[in-house]
A protein has these predicted regions:
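Catalytic cores of Mg2+-dependent Asp-rich isoprenoid enzymes
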Residues: 1-166, 172, 176-290
Length: 290
Protein backbone atom coordinates (compact mmCIF):
# COMPACT_ATOMS: atom_id res chain seq x y z
CA UNK A 1 0.00 0.00 0.00
CA UNK A 2 1.43 3.37 -0.95
CA UNK A 3 2.04 6.06 1.62
CA UNK A 4 -0.48 8.37 0.03
CA UNK A 5 -3.11 5.64 -0.02
CA UNK A 6 -2.62 5.00 3.69
CA UNK A 7 -2.73 8.69 4.49
CA UNK A 8 -5.88 9.12 2.43
CA UNK A 9 -7.75 7.08 5.02
CA UNK A 10 -6.01 7.96 8.27
CA UNK A 11 -8.64 6.44 10.51
CA UNK A 12 -11.09 8.08 12.84
CA UNK A 13 -11.93 7.65 16.47
CA UNK A 14 -14.12 4.65 17.01
CA UNK A 15 -17.45 4.79 18.78
CA UNK A 16 -15.88 4.22 22.17
CA UNK A 17 -12.63 6.05 21.59
CA UNK A 18 -11.48 9.10 23.49
CA UNK A 19 -11.10 12.33 21.59
CA UNK A 20 -10.66 15.78 23.04
CA UNK A 21 -10.67 17.86 19.88
CA UNK A 22 -13.72 16.77 17.96
CA UNK A 23 -16.04 19.10 19.85
CA UNK A 24 -16.38 22.82 19.32
CA UNK A 25 -13.81 24.62 21.45
CA UNK A 26 -12.41 28.09 22.01
CA UNK A 27 -10.32 27.92 18.83
CA UNK A 28 -13.45 27.36 16.74
CA UNK A 29 -15.35 30.13 18.51
CA UNK A 30 -12.50 32.59 17.97
CA UNK A 31 -12.32 31.96 14.20
CA UNK A 32 -14.54 34.99 13.39
CA UNK A 33 -11.62 37.09 14.66
CA UNK A 34 -9.46 35.73 11.83
CA UNK A 35 -9.69 37.97 8.74
CA UNK A 36 -12.06 36.47 6.21
CA UNK A 37 -9.38 35.97 3.56
CA UNK A 38 -7.30 33.93 6.03
CA UNK A 39 -10.09 32.00 7.73
CA UNK A 40 -9.97 29.10 5.27
CA UNK A 41 -6.27 28.65 5.98
CA UNK A 42 -6.92 28.61 9.74
CA UNK A 43 -9.64 26.00 9.26
CA UNK A 44 -7.25 23.90 7.14
CA UNK A 45 -4.65 23.93 9.93
CA UNK A 46 -7.28 22.92 12.51
CA UNK A 47 -8.58 20.21 10.18
CA UNK A 48 -5.09 18.76 9.76
CA UNK A 49 -4.63 18.69 13.51
CA UNK A 50 -7.99 16.93 13.87
CA UNK A 51 -7.16 14.36 11.19
CA UNK A 52 -3.89 13.23 12.71
CA UNK A 53 -5.25 13.26 16.26
CA UNK A 54 -8.20 11.14 15.15
CA UNK A 55 -5.71 8.45 14.21
CA UNK A 56 -4.19 8.48 17.70
CA UNK A 57 -7.62 8.54 19.35
CA UNK A 58 -9.06 5.76 17.21
CA UNK A 59 -9.64 2.13 18.09
CA UNK A 60 -7.12 0.61 15.65
CA UNK A 61 -4.20 -1.47 16.99
CA UNK A 62 -1.15 0.56 17.98
CA UNK A 63 1.06 -0.58 15.05
CA UNK A 64 -1.66 0.39 12.57
CA UNK A 65 -2.06 3.82 14.15
CA UNK A 66 1.65 4.49 14.01
CA UNK A 67 1.79 3.31 10.41
CA UNK A 68 -0.95 5.73 9.45
CA UNK A 69 0.81 8.57 11.21
CA UNK A 70 4.04 7.72 9.39
CA UNK A 71 2.03 7.93 6.18
CA UNK A 72 0.85 11.40 7.16
CA UNK A 73 4.48 12.49 7.47
CA UNK A 74 5.09 11.22 3.95
CA UNK A 75 1.99 13.11 2.85
CA UNK A 76 3.62 16.29 4.16
CA UNK A 77 6.53 15.55 1.80
CA UNK A 78 4.01 15.27 -1.02
CA UNK A 79 2.41 18.54 0.07
CA UNK A 80 5.76 20.33 -0.05
CA UNK A 81 6.37 18.88 -3.51
CA UNK A 82 3.02 20.24 -4.71
CA UNK A 83 1.42 16.78 -4.91
CA UNK A 84 -1.03 16.57 -1.99
CA UNK A 85 -3.30 13.52 -2.12
CA UNK A 86 -5.80 14.04 0.71
CA UNK A 87 -8.57 16.62 1.09
CA UNK A 88 -6.93 18.19 4.12
CA UNK A 89 -3.48 18.55 2.54
CA UNK A 90 -5.06 19.86 -0.66
CA UNK A 91 -6.71 22.52 1.52
CA UNK A 92 -3.29 23.29 3.03
CA UNK A 93 -1.49 23.64 -0.31
CA UNK A 94 -2.19 27.32 -0.91
CA UNK A 95 -1.80 28.41 2.75
CA UNK A 96 1.52 26.56 3.01
CA UNK A 97 3.11 28.90 0.48
CA UNK A 98 0.97 32.00 0.86
CA UNK A 99 1.41 32.23 4.62
CA UNK A 100 4.79 30.48 4.85
CA UNK A 101 3.49 27.80 7.19
CA UNK A 102 6.50 26.04 8.74
CA UNK A 103 6.57 22.42 7.63
CA UNK A 104 8.32 21.46 10.88
CA UNK A 105 5.29 22.60 12.89
CA UNK A 106 2.88 20.56 10.77
CA UNK A 107 5.15 17.59 11.39
CA UNK A 108 5.17 18.37 15.11
CA UNK A 109 1.39 17.89 15.15
CA UNK A 110 1.91 14.42 13.68
CA UNK A 111 4.68 13.66 16.18
CA UNK A 112 2.42 14.67 19.07
CA UNK A 113 -0.26 12.32 17.81
CA UNK A 114 2.38 9.61 17.53
CA UNK A 115 3.26 10.10 21.20
CA UNK A 116 -0.40 9.46 22.00
CA UNK A 117 -0.60 6.47 19.69
CA UNK A 118 2.67 5.02 20.97
CA UNK A 119 1.59 4.98 24.60
CA UNK A 120 4.05 7.65 25.73
CA UNK A 121 1.35 9.73 27.41
CA UNK A 122 0.72 7.46 30.38
CA UNK A 123 2.23 9.14 33.46
CA UNK A 124 5.07 10.47 31.28
CA UNK A 125 8.26 11.97 32.67
CA UNK A 126 8.04 15.74 32.94
CA UNK A 127 10.41 16.12 29.99
CA UNK A 128 8.11 14.06 27.75
CA UNK A 129 5.07 16.05 28.84
CA UNK A 130 6.92 19.27 27.99
CA UNK A 131 7.85 17.86 24.58
CA UNK A 132 4.26 16.77 23.97
CA UNK A 133 2.77 20.17 24.78
CA UNK A 134 5.38 21.86 22.60
CA UNK A 135 4.53 19.58 19.68
CA UNK A 136 0.76 19.72 20.07
CA UNK A 137 -0.03 23.15 21.52
CA UNK A 138 3.06 25.14 20.58
CA UNK A 139 3.02 23.97 16.97
CA UNK A 140 -0.66 24.79 16.59
CA UNK A 141 -0.36 28.37 17.86
CA UNK A 142 2.78 29.00 15.79
CA UNK A 143 0.92 27.80 12.68
CA UNK A 144 -2.12 29.95 13.42
CA UNK A 145 0.11 32.98 14.05
CA UNK A 146 1.67 32.36 10.63
CA UNK A 147 -1.79 32.25 9.06
CA UNK A 148 -2.41 35.62 10.71
CA UNK A 149 0.72 37.03 9.12
CA UNK A 150 3.35 36.72 11.84
CA UNK A 151 6.21 34.26 11.40
CA UNK A 152 8.63 36.25 13.55
CA UNK A 153 10.78 34.95 16.38
CA UNK A 154 8.57 36.88 18.81
CA UNK A 155 5.48 35.12 17.50
CA UNK A 156 7.26 31.80 17.86
CA UNK A 157 8.13 32.48 21.49
CA UNK A 158 4.56 33.58 22.16
CA UNK A 159 3.25 30.45 20.45
CA UNK A 160 5.38 28.21 22.63
CA UNK A 161 4.14 29.90 25.81
CA UNK A 162 0.44 29.99 24.90
CA UNK A 163 0.57 26.55 23.28
CA UNK A 164 2.04 24.92 26.38
CA UNK A 165 -0.40 26.68 28.70
CA UNK A 166 -3.37 25.89 26.49
CA UNK A 167 -2.46 22.23 26.08
CA UNK A 168 -1.76 21.67 29.77
CA UNK A 169 -5.17 23.19 30.51
CA UNK A 170 -7.02 20.97 28.05
CA UNK A 171 -5.13 17.92 29.30
CA UNK A 172 -6.38 18.71 32.80
CA UNK A 173 -9.86 19.27 31.43
CA UNK A 174 -9.86 15.88 29.71
CA UNK A 175 -8.20 14.00 32.57
CA UNK A 176 -11.28 11.86 33.28
CA UNK A 177 -12.10 10.69 29.74
CA UNK A 178 -8.42 10.20 28.96
CA UNK A 179 -7.83 8.07 32.06
CA UNK A 180 -10.83 5.91 31.25
CA UNK A 181 -9.28 5.36 27.82
CA UNK A 182 -5.95 4.33 29.37
CA UNK A 183 -4.11 7.67 29.15
CA UNK A 184 -2.81 9.81 31.98
CA UNK A 185 -1.19 13.17 31.27
CA UNK A 186 -0.04 13.83 34.83
CA UNK A 187 3.76 13.56 35.00
CA UNK A 188 5.14 10.72 37.07
CA UNK A 189 7.10 13.20 39.20
CA UNK A 190 3.85 14.91 40.29
CA UNK A 191 2.20 11.57 41.00
CA UNK A 192 5.16 10.46 43.10
CA UNK A 193 5.26 13.72 45.06
CA UNK A 194 1.53 13.36 45.78
CA UNK A 195 2.08 9.79 46.99
CA UNK A 196 -0.10 8.26 44.28
CA UNK A 197 0.71 4.65 43.46
CA UNK A 198 -2.04 3.12 41.34
CA UNK A 199 -2.38 -0.03 39.30
CA UNK A 200 -4.48 1.66 36.61
CA UNK A 201 -5.24 5.10 35.25
CA UNK A 202 -8.82 4.77 36.49
CA UNK A 203 -7.58 4.30 40.06
CA UNK A 204 -5.77 7.62 39.88
CA UNK A 205 -9.11 9.40 39.41
CA UNK A 206 -10.35 8.04 42.74
CA UNK A 207 -7.22 8.87 44.70
CA UNK A 208 -7.71 11.50 47.43
CA UNK A 209 -4.39 13.15 46.50
CA UNK A 210 -5.43 13.78 42.89
CA UNK A 211 -5.63 17.54 43.42
CA UNK A 212 -2.06 17.56 44.75
CA UNK A 213 -0.86 15.75 41.61
CA UNK A 214 -2.71 18.19 39.35
CA UNK A 215 -1.49 21.31 41.15
CA UNK A 216 2.03 21.49 39.61
CA UNK A 217 0.58 21.06 36.11
CA UNK A 218 -1.96 23.82 36.72
CA UNK A 219 0.75 26.05 38.17
CA UNK A 220 2.91 25.60 35.07
CA UNK A 221 -0.07 26.41 32.86
CA UNK A 222 -0.75 29.57 34.85
CA UNK A 223 2.90 30.65 34.59
CA UNK A 224 2.92 30.09 30.84
CA UNK A 225 -0.31 32.07 30.42
CA UNK A 226 1.42 34.92 32.26
CA UNK A 227 4.44 34.58 29.94
CA UNK A 228 2.16 34.68 26.90
CA UNK A 229 0.41 37.83 28.16
CA UNK A 230 3.77 39.57 28.51
CA UNK A 231 4.77 38.52 24.98
CA UNK A 232 1.48 39.35 23.24
CA UNK A 233 2.37 43.03 22.54
CA UNK A 234 5.34 41.78 20.48
CA UNK A 235 3.04 39.85 18.13
CA UNK A 236 1.89 41.54 14.91
CA UNK A 237 -1.21 43.71 15.41
CA UNK A 238 -3.55 41.77 13.07
CA UNK A 239 -2.89 38.52 14.96
CA UNK A 240 -3.62 39.84 18.42
CA UNK A 241 -7.46 39.76 18.64
CA UNK A 242 -7.68 36.05 17.81
CA UNK A 243 -4.71 35.05 19.95
CA UNK A 244 -5.86 37.18 22.88
CA UNK A 245 -9.32 35.61 22.74
CA UNK A 246 -7.82 32.10 22.71
CA UNK A 247 -5.56 32.98 25.64
CA UNK A 248 -8.39 34.43 27.73
CA UNK A 249 -10.77 31.56 26.99
CA UNK A 250 -8.24 28.99 28.16
CA UNK A 251 -7.31 31.04 31.22
CA UNK A 252 -11.01 31.03 32.13
CA UNK A 253 -11.10 27.26 31.62
CA UNK A 254 -8.13 26.80 33.96
CA UNK A 255 -9.91 28.86 36.62
CA UNK A 256 -13.04 26.72 36.19
CA UNK A 257 -11.02 23.54 36.62
CA UNK A 258 -9.36 24.95 39.74
CA UNK A 259 -12.76 25.77 41.22
CA UNK A 260 -14.05 22.26 40.52
CA UNK A 261 -11.01 20.62 42.07
CA UNK A 262 -10.88 16.85 42.15
CA UNK A 263 -14.44 16.70 40.80
CA UNK A 264 -13.18 17.96 37.45
CA UNK A 265 -11.70 14.51 36.79
CA UNK A 266 -14.91 12.60 37.44
CA UNK A 267 -17.49 15.02 36.05
CA UNK A 268 -18.02 15.63 32.32
CA UNK A 269 -15.32 17.99 31.03
CA UNK A 270 -16.53 21.59 31.07
CA UNK A 271 -17.19 23.15 27.68
CA UNK A 272 -16.57 26.82 27.01
CA UNK A 273 -19.67 28.87 27.77
CA UNK A 274 -21.17 29.75 24.41
CA UNK A 275 -22.51 33.10 25.56
CA UNK A 276 -19.21 34.02 27.20
CA UNK A 277 -17.19 33.01 24.14
CA UNK A 278 -19.52 34.87 21.77
CA UNK A 279 -19.27 37.97 23.97
CA UNK A 280 -15.49 37.69 23.96
CA UNK A 281 -15.40 37.48 20.15
CA UNK A 282 -17.61 40.57 19.86
CA UNK A 283 -15.51 42.44 22.41
CA UNK A 284 -12.29 41.73 20.57
CA UNK A 285 -13.86 42.61 17.23
CA UNK A 286 -14.73 46.08 18.47
CA UNK A 287 -11.52 46.39 20.44
CA UNK A 288 -9.47 45.48 17.39
CA UNK A 289 -5.76 44.89 17.70
CA UNK A 290 -5.17 47.37 20.49
Amino acid sequence: MSATTTAARPGTAGAGAFTSIGRLDALDWALPLVPRDRRGAARAVLAFRAEVQAVADGAAPRPEKRGRLAAWRLELDALEAGLPATPVTIALQQPLHRHRLPRTELENLVLAADMDAGGVMVAPPQCDLRLYTRRSGGALIILLAAVLGDTSHAAGCFGLALGEAMRLTTLLRDLGPAARAGRLCLPRESLAEAGIVAASTAEVLDHPALDAACAPVAATASERFADARLMLPEVALPARPFLRAVLEAHEDLLETLHARGRGAAVQPPPSPGRVALAARVLRHRFRGAA
